[in-house]
């Protein structure tokens, strides 16, 4: 693993740690100003879609935080190649609107440049959307 890949892996790991603490400000500080988050999710999920720029990415986190209570978010693997970091894991949560308890496996793809996240793509299995129905 190159020094750059190690640094990128550490950066993404620190983002997961901040998410666990609810520290969205830290996460936003790790992003490029024009960062792009894309949640490839069923439109029923409030944070599905594309969010470009830090202000819009902040809205992504607001929608997520207003919609669900995350009870567990283990990261199973973090793998880096060049400027790309891929992470896999699971999430357990409750949906505030429906009261349903849900779980989902996920894959997140981060692209970094100069130590900042340029893009993030989120993929979850159907368990996430089902909890919103």
Residue ranges and their predicted role:
Residues 26, 32-80:
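A solvent-exposed, acidic/Ser-Thr-rich amphipathic alpha-helical stretch
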Residues 6, 51-54, 104:
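Short, conserved loop/turn and helix-capping segments at secondary-structure boundaries
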Residues 2-4, 62-133:
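A beta-strand edge to alpha-helix "cap/lid" segment located at domain peripheries
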Residues 12, 16-19, 31, 61, ...:
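Hydrophobic alpha-helical core bundles mediating ligand binding, dimerization, or RNAP-core interactions
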Residues 6-17, 36-41, 57-61, 82, ...:
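Short charge-dense sequence patches
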